[in-house]
């Protein structure tokens, strides 16, 4: 991977800012980026990790005083966040990972300042408030992600899925792990994509491709735990263990709808909530369809053998 970095802002202009580095992975985010940058302007360092955007993303970042690092993906791991944690010029102990369609509210900023000054924990989970088609969805919460952490203790989880074709250069549902103590902040991140529903649908089609490979991997592996060991897991690993159970359940699209619309009370979120829950059910259906396609291809490759397989592709 190669990297180019903008000149650092003057230390004079940074003197009164919070000793925090914000990592912002982006690609063609000119619509979302200004609001995201404005919401963390109080941070001492902002690093925008770009993938050679063809719009005004890099120019917007530089104009806001952020450093721009260009990431070149080689088709295999690491992907963008993992690479940035290891290679970006991070100069603060504390790091906040922020997506371009997210905003740090005033309440969350105050909490971040307090916990960094206190230094009682090594990482913090942050909830997300999701704005969907103009409405804040109560059914989406809580949605905890570990986003604030001590840099030296953090790493991206590795599901061995960095080379799945057609899924881009940024992590999808891998999470950050911290070798230390963690806690939960009260105020949420605001998640509001200005690109609208079309971008959401396109993004989740890509996610479904990646998830299909993960589902296939998990279904081909043993569970690897029993009830006693499951009960001893921490919250993060218990969630991962539940996912291995989930991929084995029948009727997942229906279960997904019931979970979101009934158990998580999506029916209280109006027509936007109903639309979101239907789309999440369809998302689960798409994952299953793509997993069936993968199994069919696997069976065909086994049946014809590698040499015949090459000849068929050449003939096509």
Indicate residue ranges for each PLM-predicted region:
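Catalytic-site signature of metal-activated, phosphate-bearing donor transferases
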Residues: 5-6, 78-79, 85, 105-295
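Cell-envelope/extracellular polymer assembly enzymes that use nucleotide-activated donors
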Residues: 19-21
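Short, well-formed alpha-helical segments that are part of the catalytic scaffolds
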Residues: 23-45
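Short beta-strand/loop segment that forms part of the nucleotide-sugar
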Residues: 24, 43-53, 69-70, 100
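Acidic helix N-cap motif at the loop->helix transition within catalytic regions
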Residues: 31-34, 55-64, 107-108
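A conserved acidic beta->alpha catalytic loop
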Residues: 39, 50-62, 73
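Active-site nucleotide-sugar/metal-binding loop of Leloir-type enzymes
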Residues: 63, 82-94
